[in-house]
Protein backbone atom coordinates (compact mmCIF):
# COMPACT_ATOMS: atom_id res chain seq x y z
CA UNK A 1 0.00 0.00 0.00
CA UNK A 2 2.78 2.37 0.82
CA UNK A 3 4.40 1.85 -2.55
CA UNK A 4 1.13 2.33 -4.36
CA UNK A 5 0.52 5.65 -2.63
CA UNK A 6 4.00 6.84 -3.51
CA UNK A 7 3.56 5.92 -7.15
CA UNK A 8 0.27 7.85 -7.40
CA UNK A 9 1.66 11.17 -6.22
CA UNK A 10 4.32 12.61 -8.55
CA UNK A 11 6.13 12.09 -11.84
CA UNK A 12 9.77 13.04 -12.54
CA UNK A 13 11.84 12.64 -15.75
CA UNK A 14 14.17 9.70 -16.04
CA UNK A 15 17.27 11.92 -16.07
CA UNK A 16 16.49 13.26 -12.55
CA UNK A 17 16.27 9.87 -10.84
CA UNK A 18 19.92 9.52 -9.92
CA UNK A 19 20.05 13.14 -8.78
CA UNK A 20 17.04 12.56 -6.49
CA UNK A 21 18.61 9.48 -4.93
CA UNK A 22 21.94 11.24 -4.38
CA UNK A 23 20.45 14.30 -2.73
CA UNK A 24 18.11 12.25 -0.55
CA UNK A 25 21.00 10.24 0.84
CA UNK A 26 22.71 13.44 1.96
CA UNK A 27 19.78 14.54 4.12
CA UNK A 28 20.27 13.69 7.80
CA UNK A 29 17.68 11.36 9.26
CA UNK A 30 16.04 10.79 5.91
CA UNK A 31 16.10 7.32 4.42
CA UNK A 32 17.33 6.94 0.90
CA UNK A 33 14.63 6.93 -1.67
CA UNK A 34 14.58 4.05 -4.06
CA UNK A 35 13.54 4.88 -7.54
CA UNK A 36 10.50 2.93 -8.63
CA UNK A 37 11.19 0.25 -11.10
CA UNK A 38 10.38 0.99 -14.68
CA UNK A 39 7.36 -0.82 -15.89
CA UNK A 40 8.04 -3.48 -18.46
CA UNK A 41 7.74 -2.27 -22.03
CA UNK A 42 7.99 1.40 -21.13
CA UNK A 43 10.62 3.28 -23.15
CA UNK A 44 13.59 4.87 -21.47
CA UNK A 45 13.06 8.52 -20.64
CA UNK A 46 9.33 8.29 -19.86
CA UNK A 47 8.11 10.15 -16.81
CA UNK A 48 7.91 7.93 -13.69
CA UNK A 49 6.31 8.52 -10.29
CA UNK A 50 9.16 9.59 -7.96
CA UNK A 51 9.60 11.82 -4.95
CA UNK A 52 10.93 15.30 -5.80
CA UNK A 53 14.12 16.87 -4.47
CA UNK A 54 13.54 19.15 -1.45
CA UNK A 55 16.68 20.88 -0.31
CA UNK A 56 15.47 22.47 2.95
CA UNK A 57 13.22 20.81 5.53
CA UNK A 58 11.70 17.38 5.76
CA UNK A 59 9.85 15.79 2.91
CA UNK A 60 6.17 16.10 3.72
CA UNK A 61 4.34 15.93 0.40
CA UNK A 62 5.30 14.59 -2.98
CA UNK A 63 4.98 17.12 -5.77
CA UNK A 64 6.31 17.21 -9.37
CA UNK A 65 9.88 18.45 -9.66
CA UNK A 66 8.98 20.90 -12.47
CA UNK A 67 6.53 22.69 -10.18
CA UNK A 68 9.21 22.98 -7.48
CA UNK A 69 11.68 24.56 -9.90
CA UNK A 70 9.20 27.10 -11.33
CA UNK A 71 7.23 27.84 -8.19
CA UNK A 72 7.70 31.42 -6.93
CA UNK A 73 7.83 30.26 -3.30
CA UNK A 74 11.16 28.49 -3.89
CA UNK A 75 12.98 31.86 -3.71
CA UNK A 76 13.68 33.18 -0.29
CA UNK A 77 12.44 36.55 0.88
CA UNK A 78 15.94 37.99 0.94
CA UNK A 79 16.43 37.02 -2.69
CA UNK A 80 13.14 38.62 -3.71
CA UNK A 81 14.06 41.85 -1.95
CA UNK A 82 17.46 41.87 -3.62
CA UNK A 83 15.95 41.32 -7.08
CA UNK A 84 13.37 44.06 -6.53
CA UNK A 85 16.10 46.45 -5.39
CA UNK A 86 18.21 45.65 -8.46
CA UNK A 87 15.25 46.29 -10.79
CA UNK A 88 14.48 49.66 -9.18
CA UNK A 89 18.16 50.66 -9.34
CA UNK A 90 18.34 49.67 -13.02
CA UNK A 91 15.22 51.71 -13.88
CA UNK A 92 16.57 54.73 -12.04
CA UNK A 93 19.95 54.45 -13.79
CA UNK A 94 18.33 54.17 -17.22
CA UNK A 95 16.07 57.13 -16.50
CA UNK A 96 18.96 59.27 -15.28
CA UNK A 97 21.03 58.32 -18.31
CA UNK A 98 18.16 59.24 -20.68
CA UNK A 99 17.64 62.59 -18.99
CA UNK A 100 21.37 63.28 -19.17
CA UNK A 101 21.51 62.52 -22.91
CA UNK A 102 18.43 64.65 -23.49
CA UNK A 103 19.97 67.60 -21.62
CA UNK A 104 23.19 67.30 -23.64
CA UNK A 105 21.20 67.20 -26.89
CA UNK A 106 19.22 70.32 -25.94
CA UNK A 107 22.41 72.18 -25.02
CA UNK A 108 24.01 71.20 -28.35
CA UNK A 109 20.98 72.37 -30.32
CA UNK A 110 20.94 75.69 -28.47
CA UNK A 111 24.64 76.22 -29.22
CA UNK A 112 24.26 75.39 -32.92
CA UNK A 113 21.04 77.31 -33.55
CA UNK A 114 22.61 80.82 -33.67
CA UNK A 115 25.30 79.58 -36.08
CA UNK A 116 22.72 77.97 -38.36
CA UNK A 117 20.64 81.14 -38.41
CA UNK A 118 23.67 83.24 -39.33
CA UNK A 119 24.93 81.01 -42.13
CA UNK A 120 22.28 78.58 -43.48
CA UNK A 121 24.39 77.74 -46.55
CA UNK A 122 27.22 76.51 -44.33
CA UNK A 123 24.75 74.37 -42.42
CA UNK A 124 23.63 72.77 -45.69
CA UNK A 125 27.17 72.03 -46.81
CA UNK A 126 28.58 70.94 -43.43
CA UNK A 127 29.12 67.34 -42.33
CA UNK A 128 28.17 65.74 -39.06
CA UNK A 129 30.59 64.07 -36.65
CA UNK A 130 30.41 60.79 -38.55
CA UNK A 131 31.42 62.53 -41.79
CA UNK A 132 28.03 62.12 -43.49
CA UNK A 133 27.21 64.92 -45.93
CA UNK A 134 24.03 66.74 -45.02
CA UNK A 135 21.35 67.21 -47.64
CA UNK A 136 20.60 70.77 -48.81
CA UNK A 137 17.64 72.55 -47.37
CA UNK A 138 14.42 72.15 -49.30
CA UNK A 139 12.46 75.07 -50.64
CA UNK A 140 14.83 76.34 -53.33
CA UNK A 141 17.48 77.85 -51.06
CA UNK A 142 20.83 79.26 -52.26
CA UNK A 143 22.61 75.93 -51.81
CA UNK A 144 20.01 74.09 -53.87
CA UNK A 145 20.06 76.70 -56.63
CA UNK A 146 23.85 76.59 -56.74
CA UNK A 147 23.78 72.81 -57.00
CA UNK A 148 21.30 72.96 -59.88
CA UNK A 149 23.39 75.57 -61.70
CA UNK A 150 26.53 73.46 -61.31
CA UNK A 151 24.66 70.45 -62.65
CA UNK A 152 23.38 72.49 -65.60
CA UNK A 153 26.85 73.88 -66.38
CA UNK A 154 28.32 70.38 -66.33
CA UNK A 155 25.61 69.13 -68.67
CA UNK A 156 26.16 72.07 -71.02
CA UNK A 157 29.90 71.33 -71.08
CA UNK A 158 29.22 67.72 -72.03
CA UNK A 159 26.81 68.90 -74.73
CA UNK A 160 29.48 71.23 -76.12
CA UNK A 161 31.86 68.31 -76.55
CA UNK A 162 29.13 66.33 -78.31
CA UNK A 163 28.33 69.26 -80.61
CA UNK A 164 31.99 69.70 -81.47
CA UNK A 165 32.38 66.04 -82.37
CA UNK A 166 29.15 66.06 -84.38
CA UNK A 167 30.17 69.22 -86.21
CA UNK A 168 33.49 67.70 -87.24
CA UNK A 169 31.87 64.46 -88.38
CA UNK A 170 29.14 66.36 -90.23
CA UNK A 171 31.71 68.52 -92.02
CA UNK A 172 33.71 65.50 -93.15
CA UNK A 173 30.64 63.72 -94.46
CA UNK A 174 29.43 66.85 -96.23
CA UNK A 175 32.83 67.31 -97.90
CA UNK A 176 32.76 63.73 -99.19
CA UNK A 177 29.24 64.16 -100.55
CA UNK A 178 30.17 67.42 -102.28
CA UNK A 179 33.17 65.77 -103.93
CA UNK A 180 31.02 62.92 -105.21
CA UNK A 181 28.35 65.27 -106.58
CA UNK A 182 30.69 67.76 -108.26
CA UNK A 183 30.97 65.93 -111.63
CA UNK A 184 27.18 65.67 -111.85
CA UNK A 185 26.74 69.36 -111.03
CA UNK A 186 29.18 70.30 -113.80
CA UNK A 187 27.19 68.32 -116.34
CA UNK A 188 23.95 69.82 -115.05
CA UNK A 189 25.34 73.33 -115.45
CA UNK A 190 26.06 72.70 -119.11
CA UNK A 191 22.54 71.42 -119.71
CA UNK A 192 20.81 74.27 -117.83
CA UNK A 193 22.64 76.88 -119.92
CA UNK A 194 20.45 75.74 -122.81
CA UNK A 195 17.24 76.43 -120.83
CA UNK A 196 16.64 80.21 -120.54
CA UNK A 197 15.39 81.44 -117.16
CA UNK A 198 15.62 78.01 -115.57
CA UNK A 199 16.80 79.15 -112.13
CA UNK A 200 14.47 82.14 -111.99
CA UNK A 201 11.42 79.96 -112.71
CA UNK A 202 12.51 77.32 -110.20
CA UNK A 203 12.96 79.97 -107.49
CA UNK A 204 9.63 81.67 -108.17
CA UNK A 205 7.86 78.29 -108.14
CA UNK A 206 9.37 77.25 -104.81
CA UNK A 207 6.61 77.43 -102.14
CA UNK A 208 8.78 79.20 -99.57
CA UNK A 209 10.82 81.37 -101.94
CA UNK A 210 7.75 82.56 -103.81
CA UNK A 211 6.41 84.20 -100.63
CA UNK A 212 9.32 86.67 -100.52
CA UNK A 213 9.53 87.44 -104.26
CA UNK A 214 7.82 90.67 -105.22
CA UNK A 215 6.96 91.95 -108.73
CA UNK A 216 10.17 93.97 -108.85
CA UNK A 217 12.08 90.87 -107.74
CA UNK A 218 10.61 88.95 -110.68
CA UNK A 219 11.93 91.58 -113.06
CA UNK A 220 15.37 91.36 -111.48
CA UNK A 221 15.32 87.56 -111.71
CA UNK A 222 14.59 87.75 -115.44
CA UNK A 223 18.23 88.85 -115.87
CA UNK A 224 19.58 85.98 -113.82
CA UNK A 225 21.63 83.53 -115.91
CA UNK A 226 22.77 80.88 -113.46
CA UNK A 227 23.23 79.89 -109.86
CA UNK A 228 26.18 78.06 -108.33
CA UNK A 229 26.91 76.88 -104.83
CA UNK A 230 30.36 75.84 -103.69
CA UNK A 231 31.97 74.91 -100.42
CA UNK A 232 35.40 76.22 -99.50
CA UNK A 233 37.65 76.41 -96.45
CA UNK A 234 36.62 73.05 -94.94
CA UNK A 235 38.10 74.05 -91.58
CA UNK A 236 35.58 76.89 -91.21
CA UNK A 237 32.88 75.09 -93.23
CA UNK A 238 32.23 78.04 -95.50
CA UNK A 239 29.64 78.00 -98.29
CA UNK A 240 29.28 80.50 -101.13
CA UNK A 241 26.30 81.24 -103.36
CA UNK A 242 27.03 82.92 -106.70
CA UNK A 243 24.26 84.59 -108.73
CA UNK A 244 25.21 85.31 -112.35
CA UNK A 245 23.40 88.18 -114.07
CA UNK A 246 23.38 89.50 -117.57
CA UNK A 247 23.50 93.22 -118.30
CA UNK A 248 20.61 94.88 -116.50
CA UNK A 249 19.39 98.36 -115.60
CA UNK A 250 19.89 97.89 -111.85
CA UNK A 251 23.54 97.18 -111.03
CA UNK A 252 26.82 96.63 -112.78
CA UNK A 253 27.75 93.43 -110.93
CA UNK A 254 28.00 90.37 -113.15
CA UNK A 255 28.24 88.15 -110.09
CA UNK A 256 26.67 88.72 -106.68
CA UNK A 257 28.03 86.47 -103.94
CA UNK A 258 26.71 85.58 -100.51
CA UNK A 259 29.02 83.78 -98.07
CA UNK A 260 27.73 81.77 -95.13
CA UNK A 261 29.35 79.74 -92.42
CA UNK A 262 27.75 76.41 -91.68
CA UNK A 263 27.49 75.37 -88.03
CA UNK A 264 25.56 72.84 -86.03
CA UNK A 265 22.72 75.35 -85.58
CA UNK A 266 22.49 76.40 -89.23
CA UNK A 267 23.89 79.03 -91.58
CA UNK A 268 25.40 82.32 -90.47
CA UNK A 269 26.13 85.08 -92.99
CA UNK A 270 29.73 86.23 -93.02
CA UNK A 271 30.12 88.34 -96.18
CA UNK A 272 28.34 89.54 -99.32
CA UNK A 273 29.14 91.50 -102.47
CA UNK A 274 28.90 95.26 -102.57
CA UNK A 275 26.27 96.31 -105.09
CA UNK A 276 27.33 98.84 -107.74
CA UNK A 277 24.11 100.59 -108.58
CA UNK A 278 23.45 102.11 -112.00
CA UNK A 279 22.06 105.66 -112.09
CA UNK A 280 20.61 105.65 -108.57
CA UNK A 281 19.47 109.27 -108.98
CA UNK A 282 17.64 108.57 -112.28
CA UNK A 283 16.11 105.15 -111.65
CA UNK A 284 15.65 105.37 -107.88
CA UNK A 285 15.58 101.58 -107.59
CA UNK A 286 17.51 101.80 -104.35
CA UNK A 287 14.37 103.23 -102.75
CA UNK A 288 13.10 99.66 -102.58
CA UNK A 289 15.55 99.20 -99.73
CA UNK A 290 13.73 101.75 -97.58
CA UNK A 291 11.33 99.11 -96.23
CA UNK A 292 13.90 97.14 -94.29
CA UNK A 293 11.25 95.41 -92.20
CA UNK A 294 10.04 93.34 -95.14
CA UNK A 295 12.11 90.37 -96.24
CA UNK A 296 12.29 90.23 -100.04
CA UNK A 297 14.68 88.56 -102.41
CA UNK A 298 16.15 91.91 -103.41
CA UNK A 299 16.69 93.01 -99.79
CA UNK A 300 18.30 89.71 -98.98
CA UNK A 301 20.54 89.75 -102.07
CA UNK A 302 21.72 93.33 -101.76
CA UNK A 303 21.89 93.78 -97.97
CA UNK A 304 24.40 92.38 -95.54
CA UNK A 305 23.05 90.29 -92.65
CA UNK A 306 19.43 91.14 -93.30
CA UNK A 307 17.05 89.71 -90.64
CA UNK A 308 15.77 86.32 -91.70
CA UNK A 309 18.42 85.83 -94.38
CA UNK A 310 19.66 82.61 -92.77
CA UNK A 311 16.42 80.87 -93.68
CA UNK A 312 16.72 81.88 -97.36
CA UNK A 313 20.30 80.62 -97.50
CA UNK A 314 19.19 77.31 -96.03
CA UNK A 315 16.40 76.92 -98.61
CA UNK A 316 18.67 77.68 -101.56
CA UNK A 317 21.71 75.62 -100.54
CA UNK A 318 19.97 72.60 -98.99
CA UNK A 319 16.83 72.32 -101.11
CA UNK A 320 16.78 74.36 -104.29
CA UNK A 321 20.40 73.83 -105.35
CA UNK A 322 20.46 69.99 -105.14
CA UNK A 323 16.88 69.56 -106.47
CA UNK A 324 16.05 72.39 -108.93
CA UNK A 325 14.07 70.23 -111.36
CA UNK A 326 11.64 69.33 -108.58
CA UNK A 327 10.52 72.99 -108.40
CA UNK A 328 10.70 73.84 -112.08
CA UNK A 329 7.16 74.37 -113.49
CA UNK A 330 5.85 71.16 -115.02
CA UNK A 331 4.15 72.89 -117.95
CA UNK A 332 7.51 74.29 -119.04
CA UNK A 333 9.08 70.83 -119.38
CA UNK A 334 10.08 70.15 -122.96
From Swiss-Prot:
Gene responsible for this protein: Tspy1
InterPro entries, alphabetized: NAP-like_sf, NAP_family
Cited function: May be involved in sperm differentiation and proliferation.
GO biological process, one term: cell differentiation
Region spans: Disordered: 27-46, 96-146
Organism: Rattus norvegicus
Keyword Nucleus: yes
Protein name per its UniProtKB record: Testis-specific Y-encoded protein 1
Localization of this protein: Cytoplasm; Nucleus
Compositional bias (Basic and acidic residues): 96-108, 115-128
Domain of life (superkingdom): Eukaryota
GO cellular component, one term: chromatin
PTM notes: Phosphorylated.
Amino acid sequence: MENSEEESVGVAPQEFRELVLLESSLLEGEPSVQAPEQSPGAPAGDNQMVKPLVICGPVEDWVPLAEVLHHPDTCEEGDEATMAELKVTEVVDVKNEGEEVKDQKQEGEQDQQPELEKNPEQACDSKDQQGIQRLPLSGGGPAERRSKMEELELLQLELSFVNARCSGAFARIKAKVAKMRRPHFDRRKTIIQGIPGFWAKAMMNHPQMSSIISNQDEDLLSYMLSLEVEEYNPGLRMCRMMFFFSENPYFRNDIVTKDYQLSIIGYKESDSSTIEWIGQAEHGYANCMQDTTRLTFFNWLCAHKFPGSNRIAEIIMDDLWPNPLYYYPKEDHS
